[in-house]
């Protein structure tokens, strides 16, 4: 094995941050970038009102509304490691893009608000992590505000997410009595001060919790800390690296991202124990990152990162081997050879050319409509990486143009936005009006805004009676009969796949009973199959 390749792989950490909206994910992201030297000033949440936007929020609508609705990729060094941070949408209506991004991550940092504990979106995201046994470290945020008792938060994680918890730091008070944390992993006392916003908080090594220095520093809270630490150590589990790496146990840290407290404590441990790039599954076998041949998989398409050029960028995770500028790779769905001369790396919306990349790295290649989510690339063996599916939309609207002469622009815009997978556009087998499908209502607003902003298309949406969607498959003869009898309810999505839109759950159930040889699928895999011309 090439020792350089081995070294490059083992110092990489490719991870995502997940949270419920407003738990502090964007703030934590910026503090990590600050620690890695990737940025020199954190765009704090309050600064949005002063028109300074968060580093990872770059779309116009995100800037205006102060939410993250797309996923960004940020690469930065930290303590000799090479970090690839996949920043995911925090808004509840953008979970599907998050699902796909999680397939490109080897581990996850989960951010919880100490006042709320585990919330609904966190549960949904955990379903995807559980599918892949993704290792998770938990950061309980906003300890400088009043919230739930720490033991209640641990119990909530264990009961709701079915994860064993092992606290590696323990808070001393909360709200206006928050004095800091005790690092159970390194036996250090970290003292909190609102004045130390740069994260350089005082650390005191403590060999023995009976050390009188604790009483001098913490006063009456010293005995509370001793009691809590004794309880946690006697009743709780010890850190089990194999259980963590298998997605069964989550190390837990407490802190305040806004005050930059506890972030370094958590992140130092994260880079030490988080896994390097892992094998990636394909239809035929698992691909080891240590294999010599280059392989990669497209897990995301983003249209109009540069609105001036209406570009489409494919985000490709390097799965094995070494990427080199100008190398020729086979695009296995089409069978065509591509020369990758202009691959890029990312820092939110900023990109720069990349000469080399290793497993775990994310590179961007211009797709020009040729690359789809789930497409596989390699220099040799034809492989098809398995991907997280699209999920059947739960909300539907009909698109109406304000100017009918812009129909071609509408079609182009919906096609490109659909390729991102954030919105799903369905065109009826009979008729011309597009039906939009989304997993959350806010996606419709985003689609209208982006059509206007990026494609100069003014449109409005009207309600439709559809309640649910299923992708259709089955024997050719049965499909032909099914189409003939259900023409008014059948559509093609942007990928050309046949979908059945039902007026109610009851109607769907009846149709499924009447057509037992037809498959009605609530998900659609993005594993790309060959379509050679």
Swiss-Prot record:
Location of this chain's protein in the cell: Cytoplasm
GO BP: regulation of translational termination
Annotated positions binding GTP: 19-26, 87-91, 141-144
GO cellular component: cytosol
A molecular-function term among this protein's GO annotations: translation release factor activity, codon specific
Keyword Nucleotide-binding: yes
Top-level taxon of the source organism: Bacteria
Keywords per UniProt: Cytoplasm, GTP-binding, Nucleotide-binding, Protein biosynthesis
Keyword Transit peptide: no
Domain tr-type G: 10-278
InterPro entries, alphabetized: EF-G-like_DII, EFG_III/V, G_TR_CS, P-loop_NTPase, PrfC, RF3_C, RF3_dom_3_sf, RF3_GTP-bd
Family from the record: Belongs to the TRAFAC class translation factor GTPase superfamily. Classic translation factor GTPase family. PrfC subfamily.
Family matches, as PANTHER family: PEPTIDE CHAIN RELEASE FACTOR RF3
Stated role: Increases the formation of ribosomal termination complexes and stimulates activities of RF-1 and RF-2. It binds guanine nucleotides and has strong preference for UGA stop codons. It may interact directly with the ribosome. The stimulation of RF-1 and RF-2 is significantly reduced by GTP and GDP, but not by GMP.
Protein name per the record: Peptide chain release factor 3
Gene source species: Salinibacter ruber (strain DSM 13855 / M31)
